[in-house]
């Protein structure tokens, strides 16, 4: 009998620990979602075409710039394996290989993010069901730490941060484009990637604030609920005492 009770207790402890792990997956899901969203958010680039005066800088028309940028984004986000072939601009073998590597990286991130989507949903349900709202505060803090920590190297030397990023995620230096052989790089200036990084950090800050807002609201509702239960228990106690007397 004791063995059965202990087994049930151990199983419950394991499930609770597993559930807590799903809560910790929420910040990862938010970060990956923010990265994928910004990569696919073409209006930011359209804004930069004018803001960075790319037509004058590159000598290409606005339509050509947008068309080739759209191709790069669509190619990288598409799960279908096709040959990389820009509509208007030539590409070197190294350039083609790099975009294939980017596509592979993004496709892996998308698959991983689907996994974190389900674990995050479970984590949110677990947090609300068990009324462990302090987990939402923890999620908020963890998300907020990312922009805080990344903003420092970005502000000090964004190019160096950009270089470190490529060295971490790519095994070669094919990302170092020569505009003579890969003119696509001329329409993808460093400033655009900086704006994209800032956009990601802003989104993360907003998500952090949203989770903290939920934490405060749910915590307050829990206090109200506990207060109501205590008042009801007090009334029942008083009623019971009167009945005995």
Where are these regions (language model features)?
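Transmembrane alpha-helical segments in integral membrane proteins
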Residues: 26-31, 110-128, 196-222
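Alpha-helical transmembrane signal-anchor/signal-peptide segments
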Residues: 39-57, 166
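Hydrophobic alpha-helical transmembrane segments
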Residues: 50-64, 83-93, 137-156
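Individual transmembrane alpha-helix segments
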Residues: 77-116, 191-200
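Short, membrane-exposed interhelical loops at transmembrane-helix boundaries
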Residues: 172-192
